[in-house]
Amino acid sequence: SIDHHIALEVAERLQQRFGNRYTLDNVIISATHTHSGPGGYWQSRSDSGLDGGLYPEHFEAIAAGITASIVKADDDLQPGIIFINSGRVANAGANRSAVAYEENPPAERARYRENTNTEMLLLKFVDDSGAIGMLNWYALHPTAMNFHNHLISGDHKGYASLQMEQQHGTRYASATDFVAAFAQADP
């Protein structure tokens, strides 16, 4: 998740560059959950012993990276079209705690088709040259990496982003690269 202090830092940096064009009232910063990410960037949480406390260098790298991505997007502002679509993706995941889910009141369970959310939502961003990006939400908990993993990973959502971007020719070197984001839906 994004710590509130990172959001505040990014907003301050954006205001230094753009004035009041971007503020906490009109910028949404979202992170995709992973069990394979580094810690050390939370200022609002006590030291859990798992991440060793605050690492200013890591905090700076995250705040600078988010700020740079927003500046890059602002530099490329242009008219475009946003398409939206949704659909059902069956058999792609499982409820991590089906027993606990069954303890929900019957009225709550009756609201849903299954014990997991199988709906996927997709936004597609298009300009005069074609598709320039996509944003996808699907409720699949990113725990594909096991406990023996010692590497930083975006898990299956990061891998999906990488694959989608490569299919669209992204080389991470130009302002016109396709951007794919597979965001976290339900927790």
Predicted features and spans:
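Conserved beta-alpha junction segments in alpha/beta enzyme cores
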Residues: S1-P187
